Amino acid sequence: MVHSLKWLGIFPLILFQWLGTTSSLNLEDPNVCSHWESYSVTVQESYSHPYDQVYYTSCTDILNWFKCTRHRISYRTAYRRGEKTMYRRKSQCCPGFYESREMCVPHCADKCVHGRCIAPNTCQCEPGWGGPNCSSACDVDHWGPHCSSRCQCKNGALCNPITGACHCSSGYKGWRCEERCDQGTYGNDCQQKCQCQNGASCDHVTGECRCPPGYTGAFCEDLCPPGKHGSQCEERCPCQNGGVCHHVTGECSCPAGWMGTVCGQPCPEGRYGRNCSQECQCHNGGTCDSATGQCYCSPGYNGERCQEECPVGLYGVKCAQTCQCLNGGKCYHISGACLCEPGYTGERCETPLCSEGTYGMKCDKKCPCHLQYTQSCHPMSGECACKPGRSGLYCNETCSLGFYGEFCQQICSCQNGADCDSVTGKCICAPGFTGVDCSTACPPGTYGVNCSSLCNCKNNAVCSPVDGSCTCKAGWHGVDCSINCPRGSWGLGCNLTCQCLNGGACNPLDGTCTCAPGWRGLKCELPCQDGTYGMNCIERCDCSHADGCHPATGYCRCLAGWAGMHCDSVCPGGHWGPNCSLSCDCKNGASCSPDDGICECAPGYRGTTCQRICSPGFYGHRCSQACPQCVHSNGPCHHVTGQCDCLAGFMGSLCNEVCPSGRYGKNCAGVCACTNNGTCNPIDGTCQCYPGWIGNDCSQACPPGHWGPNCIHTCNCHNGAYCSAYDGECKCSPGWTGLYCTQRCPLGYYGKECTLVCQCQNGADCDHITGQCTCRTGFMGKFCEQKCPSASYGYGCRQVCDCLNNSTCDHITGTCYCSPGWKGARCDQAVMIVVGNLNSLSRTSAAIPADSYQIGAIAGIIILVLVVLFLLALFIIYRQKQKGKDTAMPAVAYTPAVRVLSTDYTIADTLPHNNVVNANSQYFSNPSYHTLSQCTTGPQVNSMDRMMVSRSKSSQLFVNLKNLDPGKRSHTIDYTGTLPADWKQGGFLNENGLLKNSAYSISTCSLSSTENPYATIKDPPVLLPKNIECGYVEMKSPARRDSAYAEISNSSLANKNVYEVEPTVSVVQGAFCNNGKISQDLYDLPKNSHIPCHYDLLPVRESSSSNKDESTSE
């Protein structure tokens, strides 16, 4: 099988063949025909060559060591030479045509006499001529020899004068041209095809389209325009409300939200969409848009389907209205009505029940709030509600840095170190910035606070937008950059040293040297070459018998025996002529020619007798040198030396150098007196003082409260901050921070630069300056680490508790927590416990006067003894019936933790023997308990062997549980159920108010609470078949306080756990269960609770340790 072909050397052959077959015919000529012709070429091709492949495989052949030989046909690639048939295209004139001037023209065998050849052997005759070669002529209605036959052509067709054949006019066909063109064709010989679309008919002569109803356009390609339909789109659509009519029938297609023949009926309520086919999904009384289905919510709701109540703080339609409730009042999401917190009343909860500045149950406590910054003091708790911009326990602090507004919860948007107004959030921009958020730098030319100051920088210096200080360009210095760099320095800040030598001037911008006359080189280190002198050494010496000329002035240095300006005279000075006998009349040191006595003027002079100086702007020999460009001078250069006459404060050959630092005046002869980095003006010696200094010599500091150049700015620092005289920056005193030291240290910090960490505890406020702690109500100590001592409470622990009968007092509010047997606000009312069932509950006794306490106590003891005797009798009967029965029961086990505030409890399979109370136990938080109403049957566990109750020295109550032999537990039933955590446990009291010899049971009870905790119970016993009446105690958990503890022994792992029971105040109700087999146990209650006859079972869930034990036992 051939997989691929590799052509070698084929392309040159193909190219040659193609060149040989091409011609000059125009291939686009419709009369040019082409055909493919074949030819052969030799190629090398690859193919798959089969071969026999031997391989080995495992098999059961013992003789060959379980190895067998196998064969299979495989393929590999091989190459061979062969012939390849190729094809090439060849073009020539089609049959009936011949080539003429690169075109294929038709050929007629008989020459067309009165016409032209239009197709092979076909002539197109001129009007009035006919025949195969257009040589015959007859009138329009006749044909044949002598034109004797009459033409039979119809519809205006012409007949051939020779044959009588009809030549049909446009739109007709047939032997006599009596037939119209077929459908879909038109024109001459019916050769044209109609272009009409959408079923339109075509005129057989012209091809014009006749559109069907619903279409228009030259080819009927367009639908009727909107609002029109029918034949020629002349009928008007009747559709309403944006309905679209069918372009043919006019039937209306309604938009979403409308229905009916003409779309005139809106969707019925609860429906929407096209044809009203979809059902609205809006909740809470919301209505939906009939077109889109979008929900329009009723007041108080929002969300895509109106399923959400308004967020807290908003109410009404679209939740667009803001609640007006004050002082923590709750706002009704529909109408905005306020539900006030305790202590407030009024339509908006704006009226406190206590007068201003007081709080408490009797409005007798003074609010600790700073009234100036306090919105309100809670009339019940005394809690301070701060005004916007204030925070802290007593509203004595401003918002932390970066926050503002109510509760200091809004984040400031200020940038570039700006302060934020703690009330409004308005940005107080730092100097150099402006804008709402201080994000914009001051415009060029301005600086300072609010960009209100104008810069005073010269010579394109950059002005700091913060303090207006000038950053000079290269070559300038001074407070306002108005002074060139002093002599010998250049560059930025005039910090670079000039390298110019021999009196060369240094450019203060780039440090380039301008050499004095007579010197050259980059650093003016080279004298002029021999024979040259002057500026840039461009002048030529004019000396005859001299040892060169002076490089600066050009004076000739005459050789011995020669004199004169050019050293060309042997006569002594002032003489000339033969024997030097004639006297010269030349002035100003000129010499005269030894030959003719003409004056040769000294440099700087001119005239016949050299009595005149050079014209302004020129100097030197023959006054031919132009003065240099003097920068700071009184006029043109000196006529002799070319030296510039510098103004005060300048020096150098071109007067382009400022006096050296510390000098000023004409020829820099004055000595500056400026101090404290003041800049001396080189012209008159006046001082430009550095910011923060004033005075003629800059020796006086700015007076307090002022800063900047000439001390023109006023400081804006607060709270004792130090103001920098240079830039006005505030150095805050301890306890303050911010741009102008207007903000206290952030919470938790104090002291210098707010770097010290506060040590206050229990939510106490920390003084931002000293770090001293201001304790919250109920705490005291240096760091507020101590609760108020016993019998005191409140702010500063200055209020005395008013609780009686060994009751405890809340260290914050002073609320009394009564000891067992007492109730009332001051625990001054005794309580009598009466036992009954759920259907006939006895009420607690009325309040007993304090002076009748002993009588009530004796009566209670008597009743208690009777109850205990009755329970003992029942217990004896119960024990007799329980003998021989299965004693297995679940035990309460607790997941170990360290003071865990959760409800992780587990019911294990059974209680083991010999459980011992361990005093070193972990703690668990007591859960909330609920009022038990009608009980339903729960799983029952029978036969607790013994329950012993003892009281420890620390007044804590302990329950010691001991089970019977765990080997007697039934293994026939093993299931896991999930039960509510509020299944109850009941029991009876003995003479000591404790339980003895009681069974253990669980029952489910309906709750008025909305909480729904669950626990997993492993191996529950068989459920009882009937309802059980149970006694109960309502247990409620107020604020967490110190409490007594009950210890429950755990399983065989000996993990002992203690759970914390919070103080409770509740109505005590008693009951006993009608079924004698269902006796109940009781956990000990805290010392400040009433004695119950029933206690809630702790919420339980299966623990990992319990599961591990179960798997081991199984």
Curated annotation (Swiss-Prot):
PANTHER family: MULTIPLE EPIDERMAL GROWTH FACTOR-LIKE DOMAINS PROTEIN 10, SCAVENGER RECEPTOR CLASS F
Keywords recorded for this protein, A-Z: Cell adhesion, Cell membrane, Disulfide bond, EGF-like domain, Membrane, Myogenesis, Phagocytosis, Repeat, Signal, Transmembrane, Transmembrane helix
A biological process from GO: skeletal muscle satellite cell activation
Gene Ontology, cellular component aspect: plasma membrane
Coiled-coil stretches noted in the UniProt entry, renumbered to this chain: none
Cysteine disulfide links: 33-94, 59-68, 93-104, 108-117, 112-123, 125-134, 147-159, 153-166, 168-177, 190-202, 196-209, 211-220, 233-245, 239-252, 254-263, 280-288, 282-295, 297-306, 319-331, 325-338, 340-349, 408-420, 414-427, 429-438, 451-463, 457-470, 472-481, 494-506, 500-513, 515-524, 580-592, 586-599, 601-610, 668-680, 674-687, 689-698, 715-723, 717-730, 732-741, 754-766, 760-773, 775-784, 801-809, 803-816, 818-827
Protein name: Multiple epidermal growth factor-like domains protein 10
Pfam families: EGF_laminin (PF00053), EGF_PEAR1L (PF23301), hEGF (PF12661)
Position of the signal peptide: 1-24
Keyword Signal: yes
Cited function: Membrane receptor involved in phagocytosis. May also regulate homotypic retinal neuron repulsion. May play role in cell adhesion and motility. May also be an essential factor in the regulation of myogenesis, controlling the balance between skeletal muscle satellite cells proliferation and differentiation.
Gene3D superfamilies per UniProt: Tie2 ligand-binding domain superfamily (2.170.300.10)
Record gene name: megf10
PROSITE patterns: EGF_1 (PS00022), EGF_2 (PS01186), EGF_3 (PS50026), EMI (PS51041)
